[in-house]
UniProtKB/Swiss-Prot annotation:
Species for this entry: Homo sapiens (Human)
GO cellular component terms, A-Z: chromatin; chromosome; mitochondrion; nucleoplasm; RNA polymerase I complex
EC number(s) per entry: 2.7.7.6
Binding, Mg(2+) 2: 588, 590
Gene it is expressed from: POLR1A
Broad enzyme group: transferase
Regions of compositional bias (Acidic residues) in chain numbering: 1391-1412, 1422-1446, 1462-1474
Region (Rudder): 403-416
Consequence of substituting residue 496 to I: In AFDCIN; likely pathogenic
Cross-referenced Gene3D superfamilies: 1.10.132.30, 1.10.357.120, 2.40.40.20, 3.30.70.2850, 6.10.250.2940, RNA polymerase ii, RNA polymerase II, clamp domain, RNA polymerase Rpb1, domain 3
Phosphoserine: modified positions: 240, 1386
Gene Ontology MF, one: DNA binding
Designated name of the protein: DNA-directed RNA polymerase I subunit RPA1
Lineage: Eukaryota, Metazoa, Chordata, Craniata, Vertebrata
């Protein structure tokens, strides 16, 4: 049997990564490249050059000399460049460096303990079979063994572990299947990473006791080595072993050549190969004798890729070579030079011993006479220097071939292998993940309301180009013959015929006879020897009813691609789209373009017709809200058509019904007229009813619906009605929509019913009759409303609609006049100034607030101003709207538009008729310039609200220039935001999608990742599909009950009941209820033994047992235990029964898809509540319902079961899209500007990035909130607790600082600058209420800490001057040098974390983000510099000082390092105060009792301050009240002068006198809890959970909450953190009024915490993924490729990314199963 070209007969099962060995590459290569010129002078490939024809043709003109094929058939052949000197393999350079660092160069062994090696080896072996728990078991075995035998030998350890390992490996059931799971991969990479990090830095070799050789790497191209000063030789070293460190090298520093590194590595492999082979498992060569060859770390020759993959591009006559070729050419040039140099050195016998002499014949000939001119181009003195230099140059050129970033010094870079793979333009993302497609069209879209909502208008141009391959059969041959005869240019025609053997016949556009001939032979089989299988295939044009996929970019969520049926429009040039679909695509018609794709197989078409069709996409997966809906004109038309008093004559009625039902097949049902005399009239409501009863499918009962319209009942009321007892204004009003059996009886239809809003008419039709019917309803209503506007109504808007009555206008003017005087009052209120304060005083204070560092007061002024002007704008709006308008609704067309939801909002009408109101930028009033003006036309600090952006003008009468300017500022802000936002949210969405792409609901209803690991046992914790749950709310139950007949019929209730038995689930629910009725208080649950012991306790006590306490148990307890054990079975069972736990929820016991009525507990309670309510209602009502109570319950349970999520649903992608898509609507910089009484919170995309992408341990605005217990005692004490937790800075208690500067000359040389600093503190009364502090404490702080800080900062300022250098220098000792290495290492780790925070910026985000990441980088560099300078200058002083210094130096990292002063709170932690809580109860002791106040004591205090630093000359302080102190500082005269006062002020603002670790501020806010009771909540900025635990009697710790997810996870465990993640994401969206279904959030949170720790969705989080291809297609492809190669990873091709890369069908959706055909 012939296999046709496109018949798959083999399938990819997996991909493994590994490295070719040198021998294999030699065999693969067809040519050794030796000629550095790749093209000769004529532009043809030169022999032995990089474009040699043996490597395959470089363009279409040439023929391959290896396989003699042309360009299109030869796939190319590898060549190689032989390197005269060995170089390091750039891929493995970092690992080689670690290996050299962690091994002894003397005895060639690893320096880590033997136990570590054997443990890791066994752990890696058990992980290969997926035995995770064995990893920890092995650690336990080893620890136990080491405790028993303190000094075991390596073989003993091995035996101990080996036994357990072999047992595990042999008893394994899964085979290697278990190894490709996320947890195993994570564990493996963790163990290996830990090994490299922790065990590669021993101080000396444990085997031969030699010290460590220090290896350094420079520029990724050379290794330098410092040998140890002492080497221990073992006596019996055999001659055969490679020598260790030679005598001459001891203590020297030198350059480690690749050759000597290779020798060491080979020796190391002999000793440690058994272990290292496992560590680098990816490099085992199965075909070779030895397992793994260390020569992989080195390159002896370089592979040259085939020419076709680096083509020469031609532009006119010029030729540009490919970047890869340039890189290889640089290597070639070096090779030629090195060969010459080596030949010369061999001639002069100056070769170093590690370089072999050249042996080839050519080189021997060349030894005779060598031109020495080339030496001048090489750097270096002697020949050996020159050799080493060019060797390093060769190394860096080889590096560039792999990765052009590796050479930081080269300016013009050509892409290396890494650059070809990575980023958006790389191979993975551009050519494997996304590919260009055929059979697609793109054009501008324009609106059309006459096609169906599920159609798309296709212009003729596209219709004749897009074709579909249709097999010819006897029943369609007629049609296809006609198509072939019509040819490629006439629609419906065909462009090509594919014959049975796969050959193609193109149909000629001009030759009619050729087409006819082909048409006649469509069914006659082709003549040929073997009988071919199959038939001819005709590529026919698109015709009406074909399905196309439409897509508009950006494709942010599932509805951005939907399937539409084609409708061919002959005269058009553009795609025509129905208005209703705009919202799904987020399209408008201002020039948007869309893409259409034409599926090419019956399978693809079937999926498009049934699943992707527009009718099925009515609800959005984000939160189940409808997307499709009619717009603008249709709203106005529909509302006015269904208003009371709208009548039609017979011909108008028929015309409208016909217009609405143009494509109905069959009879049209009509309604009888509602008015008969004087002549028959039909109402507008009847027209709509006629449509409805004709659209609803024949065999279904029409629907019943009670709902509300968008236009409120109040809007129709012209004047207030007389009060009538029991009158309900909404009953039978136009705002109440009632539909009975498909007839609209009451109410106006507007946006709430056919717009994109939930629970309207269209949504209800979708729920009961399915998507097809709801689509028809939308289509027909659109046609009907359009016709009504065209024929009978028309709609316009004039000036009359916006005019205001004169009376209202006068009122408006008066309020505006009043508003101009509110300024001074607002500033006074904000700054707590007295009423009497003069304007100048107020203005001065305002200026201070504006120019001061702490912007809180200024924000407060802003806030007060906003409150004041809001009041006035509301007043104006009340005066003008709605009764102040000249015309009122419904005559007023503008109001009609706004009320019916067509366009515009009340804000727009107010801006037209009332005033524009307060202009805000980023949430605050327009900022002031430095001069205090907001715009040049105002005075500085002007009080009128107008100057702060309050626009009193309106568009009706025009606005003034400054107001216009403010208005434009607000407009500009919106544009800036949109531009910046896109890249941020786009990258965020990409991160989530790449992580969650594999999560799919399986056939057992679990959600699993692509490697099979269970993320959730039921999707979203109840297994329901979001769009189907919309009517499972108690509010919608009445609708379901009133339409029960339709639902039972459409959902096949009787069939379900005949198959599924609800008894098991119902029985289970009964058991749970029974248990709950017996245990009303679920908190007090006791075990069986406890209940028993309580009962017999008294009896045992009476026995008065006398015996000693054994094992810490009293005799009474032992007696009780004995009695319990001796109790007979029956009595014991009685106790156990009482103590039985509550049965598990039904969902976890009975699978909901198999067992009917197994529903979630919440739903069960909702159904219970509703059925009681319903039963009560039916008793009251006059007519008895046919629906029985049981039937109602069964109906709701059926609806629930039918709402389960289908297997195959890609819930991971839906969750990612549902978080990513709304985040594009969030404005980027929404700050929550804190006034004085509020917390600062990170919002919007920055907060989302913090939670999802970074999962950072130190978040920007950490906070805790705890409700205060509602007891008198607690409410009293919480005030002092708040005071105690608030941190105090020196700046807050300083009144002023006086600085006097003078000059002093003692002798000729000694000139001094003398500063006298006098600090005046605020009186105690000022801060007594707020701060936990006394004047003495401040003074003590100044003396012990502040002056030290001051001297430190002066020293920093003057570091360049030598005088300060001499004060404290300290020699660097050997110990420091040793520590430097350690320090570098720990800093490396820190940098890792830092990087995690700052540098997760992929290409996309960087586009709009250069400034931000630069700033971050700069900040990081500065920080590092800080750390280093700190190391040099640190004094041996108290640790606290460093703490304080660090805090000083890095005020922006305060959150990270608060002064650790819990134990010794300055000023409070004196010896007398035992602990903090005591403060709340004990009265303060007066000061003088603590400190002796004599002259000696004073002298001692002054002396202590003087001793702080030589430059402190004198000190005085206030002995009476402790309200001031004065210090004199005498500095040697410097070259540099600096401003002492600014230095002192800035220090004072940052110096912390008193703080609770981690907490900066405390606030008490009043809120209402769930039960609507008021309660106090304590909010803190900063986090310190253990501190709050001390105050259990004040705070309700059970309800403590914090937004720091790591803190919660560490304190309360991962499940608590999971809930915090959900709540935090929900809160971020809630600020913008965006609802995201909690099921999405729970899935994301579950995924992030899957491994038991909270992991980010970034490249650090994807490290544990079991699919290397998924990692590589995400970010840093090269990194992951190296990793996969080293570990020899295997990709099972299960993840969607991996499937896309190799072209498999993704295992999700319809790809989750396979249809197999019985062949019998």
């Amino acid at each position: 049997m012939l296999i046709s070209k496109n018949m798959p007969w083999r399938r990819l099962q997996g991909i493994s990564f590994g490295m070719y060995s040198a021998e294999e590459l030699k065999k693969l290569s067809v040519k050794s490249i030796t000629n550095p010129r790749y093209l000769d002078s004529l532009g043809n490939p030169s022999a032995n050059g990089l474009y040699d024809l043996a490597l395959g043709p470089a363009d279409s003109k040439e023929v391959c000399s290896t396989c003699v094929q042309d360009f299109s058939n030869c796939s190319g052949h590898l060549g190689h460049i032989e390197l005269p000197l060995t170089v390091y393999n750039p891929l493995l350079f970092d690992k080689l460096y670690l290996l050299l660092r962690g091994s002894c160069l003397n005895c060639h062994m690893l320096t880590c303990p033997r136990a570590v090696i054997h443990l890791l080896l066994c752990q890696l072996r058990v992980l290969e079979v997926g035995a995770l728990q064995a990893v920890y078991e092995l650690e336990r075995i080893l620890n136990r063994f080491l405790e028993e035998n303190p000094d075991p030998s390596a073989s003993e350890i091995r035996e101990e572990l080996e036994q357990y390992t072999t047992e595990i490996v042999q008893n394994n059931l899964l085979g290697s299947q278990g190894a490709h799971v996320k947890n195993v991969c994570e564990s493996k990479s963790k163990l290996i990473a830990l090994f490299w990090k922790a065990h590669m830095n021993a101080k000396r070799c444990p085997h031969c006791k030699t010290g460590r050789s220090v290896v350094r790497k420079e520029h990724n191209s050379k290794l330098t080595i410092t040998f140890p000063a002492m080497v221990h030789r073992t006596a019996g070293q055999k001659d055969s072993e490679p020598l260790g460190i030679e005598e001459a090298q001891i203590g020297k520093r030198g350059y480690l050549t690749p050759t000597s590194a290779r020798e060491h590595l080979s020796a190391l492999w002999k000793n440690e190969g058994f272990f290292l082979n496992y560590l680098f498992s990816g490099m085992d060569d199965d075909g070779m004798e030895s397992r793994f060859n260390p020569s992989v770390f080195f390159l002896d020759f370089l592979v040259v890729p085939p020419s076709r993959y680096r083509p020469v591009s031609r532009l006119g006559d010029q030729m540009f070579t490919n970047g890869q070729t340039v890189n290889l050419q640089a290597v070639m040039k070096d090779v030629v030079l090195i060969r010459k140099l080596l030949a010369l050195m061999a001639q002069e016998q100056k070769l170093p011993e590690e370089v072999a002499t050249p042996t080839t014949d050519e080189e021997k000939d060349s030894l005779i006479a060598i031109d020495r001119s080339f030496l001048s181009t090489l750097p270096g003195q002697s020949l050996i220097d020159k050799l080493y230099n060019i060797w390093i140059r060769l190394q860096s050129h080889v590096n560039i071939v792999f990765d052009s970033e590796m050479d930081k010094l080269m300016m013009d870079k050509y892409p290396g292998i890494r650059q070809i793979l990575e980023k958006k333009e790389g191979l993975f993302r551009k050519h494997m993940m996304g590919k260009r497609v055929d059979y697609a069209a793109r054009s501008v879209i324009c609106p059309d309301m006459y096609i169906n909502t599920n159609e798309i208008g296709i212009p003729m141009v596209f219709a004749t180009k897009l074709t579909y391959p249709q097999p010819v059969t006897p029943w369609n041959v007629q049609e296809l013959r006609q198509a072939v005869i019509n040819g490629p240019n006439v629609h419906p025609g065909a462009s090509m015929v594919i014959n049975e053997d796969g050959s193609r016949t193109a149909l000629s556009a001009v030759d009619m006879t050729q087409r006819e001939a082909v048409a006649k032979q469509l069914l006659t089989p082709a003549t040929g020897a073997p009988k071919p299988q199959g038939t001819k295939i005709v590529c026919r044009h698109v015709k009406n009813g074909d399905i196309l996929l439409l897509n508009r970019q950006p494709t942010l969520h599932r509805p951005s691609i939907q399937a539409h049926r084609a409708r061919i429009l002959p005269e058009e040039k553009v795609l025509r789209l129905h208005y209703a679909n705009c919202k799904a695509y987020n399209a408008d018609f201002d020039g948007d373009e869309m893409n259409a794709h034409f599926p090419q197989s019956e399978l693809g078409r079937a999926e498009a017709y049934v699943l992707a069709c527009t009718d099925q996409q009515y609800l959005v997966p984000k939160d189940g809200q409808p997307l499709a809906g009619l717009i603008q004109d249709h709203m106005v038309s529909g509302a006015s058509m269904t208003t009371r008093g709208c009548f039609f004559t017979r011909e108008h009625y028929m015309e409208l019904v016909y217009r609405g039902l143009t494509d109905k097949v069959g009879r049209v049902k009509l309604l009888s007229p509602s008015i008969l005399k004087p002549f028959p009239l039909w109402t507008g409501k009847q027209v709509v009813s006629t449509l409805l009863i004709n659209i609803i499918p024949e065999d279904h009962i029409p629907l019943n619906l009670s709902g509300k319209a968008k236009i409120t009942g109040k809007a129709w009321v012209k004047e207030t009605p007389r009060s009538v007892p029991g009158f309900n204004p909404d009953s039978m009003c136009e705002s109440q929509v009632i539909i009975r059996e498909g007839e609209l009886l009451c109410g106006v239809l507007d946006k709430a019913h056919y717009g994109s809003s939930a629970y309207g008419l269209v949504h209800c039709c979708y729920e009961i009759y399915g998507g097809e019917t709801s689509g028809k309803v939308l289509t027909c209503l659109a046609r009907l409303f359009t016709a009504y506007l065209q024929l009978y109504r028309g709609f316009t808007l004039g000036v009359e609609d916006i005019l205001v009555k004169p009376k209202a206008d006068v009122k408006r003017q008066r309020i505006i006049e009043e508003s101009t005087h509110c300024g001074p009052q607002a500033v006074r209120a904000a700054l707590n100034l007295p009423e009497a304060a003069s304007y100048d005083e107020v203005r001065g204070k305002w200026q201070d607030a504006h120019l001061g560092k702490d912007q809180r007061d200024f924000n407060m002024i802003d806030l007060k101003f906003k409150e004041e002007v809001n009041h006035y704008s509301n007043e104006i709006n009340k005066a003008c709207m709605p009764f102040g308008l000249h015309r009122q609704f419904p005559e007023n067309s503008l109001q009609m538009m706004v009320q019916s939801g067509a366009k515009g909002s009340t804000v727009n009408t107010m801006q037209i008729s009332c005033l524009l109101g307060q202009i805000e930028l980023e949430g605050r009033r327009p900022p002031l310039m430095a001069s205090g003006k907001s715009l040049p036309c105002f005075e500085p600090y002007e009080f009128t609200p107008r100057a702060g952006g309050f626009v009193t003008g309106r568009f009706l009468t025009g606005i003034k220039p400054p107001e216009f300017f403010f208005h434009c500022m607000a407009g500009r802000e919106g544009l800036v935001d949109t531009a910046v936002k896109t890249s941020r949210s786009g990258y965020l969405q990409r991160c989530i999608i790449k992580h969650l792409e594999g999560l799919v609901v399986q056939y057992d209803l679990t959600v699993r990742d692509s490697d099979g690991s269970v993320v959730q046992f039921l999707y979203g914790e109840d297994g329901l599909d979001i769009p189907k749950t919309q009517f499972l709310q108690p509010k919608q139950f009445p609708f379901l009950a009133s339409n029960y007949e339709v639902i039972m019929k459409s959902q096949h209730l009787h069939e379900v009941l005949s198959r599924a038995d609800p008894k098991k689930a119902l029985h289970h629910f009964r058991a749970i209820k029974k248990w709950q009725s017996k245990h009303p208080n679920t908190l007090l649950r006791r075990g069986a033994f406890l209940s028993y012991s309580q009962k017999i306790q008294e009896a045992v006590k009476a026995l008065k047992l006398e015996s000693e306490n054994r094992n810490g148990r009293s005799p009474g307890t032992q007696e009780m235990l004995r009695m319990w054990y001796e109790l007979d079975e029956e009595s014991r069972r009685k106790y156990q029964k009482k103590a039985a736990a509550c049965p598990d929820p039904s969902l976890s016991v009975w699978r909901p898809d198999i067992y009917f009525a197994s529903v979630s507990e919440t739903f069960e309670t909702k159904v219970d509540d509703y059925s009681q309510e319903w039963a009560a209602q039916t008793e009251k009502s006059y007519e008895k319902s046919e629906l029985s109570l049981d039937r109602l319950r069964t109906l709701l349970q059926l609806k629930w079961q039918r709402s389960l999520c289908e297997p195959g649903e890609a819930v991971g992608l839906l969750a990612a899209q549902s978080i990513g898509e709304p985040s594009t609507q969030m404005t980027l910089n929404t700050f929550h500007f804190a006034g004085r009484g509020e917390m600062n919170v990170t919002l919007g995309i920055p907060r989302l990035r913090e939670i999802l992408m970074v999962a950072s341990a130190n978040i920007k605005t950490p906070m805790m909130s705890v409700p205060v217990l509602n007891t008198k005692k607690a409410l009293k004490r919480v005030k002092s607790l708040k005071k105690q937790l608030t941190r105090v800075c020196l700046g807050e208690v300083l009144q002023k600082i006086d600085v006097q500067e003078s000059f002093c000359m003692e002798e000729k040389q000694n000139k001094f600058q003398v500063y006298q600093l006098r600090f005046q503190f605020l009186p105690h009364a000022y801060y007594q209420q707020e701060k936990c502090l006394r004047p003495e404490d401040i003074l003590r702080f100044m003396e012990t800490r502040f002056f030290k800080l001051l001297m430190e900062s002066i020293k920093k300022k003057n570091n360049k001057a030598s005088a300060f250098r001499n004060v404290n220098t300290r020699r660097a000792t050997q110990r420091d040098l040793d520590n430097a290495g350690e320090l570098g290492r720990s800093r490396g780790e820190q940098e890792g974390d830092e990087e995690e925070e700052g540098h997760i910026v992929d290409a996309e985000a960087e586009e709009g983000d250069a400034d931000a990441s630069d700033a971050k980088r700069k900040e990081k560099q500065e920080e590092e510099v800080d750390y280093e300078s700190e190391e040099e200058e640190e004094r041996e002083g108290e640790e606290n000082d460093d703490e304080d210094m660090q805090e000083e130096r890095n005020p922006h990292r305060e959150g990270a390092r608060k002064t650790q002063e819990q134990d010794e709170e300055v000023g409070l932690g004196t010896e007398e105060d035992p602990s903090l809580p005591a403060l709340l109860t004990q009265p303060r002791k007066p000061t003088h009792s603590q400190e002796p106040q004599g002259p000696e004591a004073m002298e001692r205090r002054v002396q202590a301050v003087r001793e702080i630093h030589p430059f402190i000359d004198d000190y005085q302080y206030d002995t009476e009240e402790s309200l001031w102190c004065q210090v004199t500082v005498k500095l040697p005269l410097m070259k540099i002068n600096f401003d002492m006062s600014s230095l002192v002020v800035s220090l004072a603002h940052g110096a912390v006198i008193y703080a609770t670790k981690g907490i900066t501020r405390c606030l008490l806010n009043e809120t209402t809890n769930n039960k609507n009771e008021k309660e106090l909540v304590l909010n803190t900025e900063g986090i310190n959970l253990p501190e709050l635990f001390k105050y259990a009697e004040v705070l309700d710790l059970r309800r403590l909450y914090s937004n720091d997810i790591h803190a919660i996870a560490n304190t309360y465990g991962i499940e608590a953190a999971l809930r915090v993640i959900e709540k935090e994401i929900k809160d971020v969206f809630a600020v913008y009024g965006i609802a995201v279904d909690p099921r999405h959030l729970s899935l994301v949170a579950d995924y992030m915490c899957f491994e038991g720790v909270y992991k980010p969705l970034n490249r650090f989080g994807i490290r544990s993924n079991s699919s290397p291809l998924q990692q590589m297609t995400f970010e840093t492809s090269f990194q992951f490729l190296k990793q996969a190669t080293m570990l020899g990873s295997h990709d099972e091709l299960r993840s969607p990314s991996a499937c896309l890369v190799v072209g498999k069908v993704v295992r999700g959706g319809t790809g989750l199963f396979e249809l197999k055909q019985p062949l019998r």
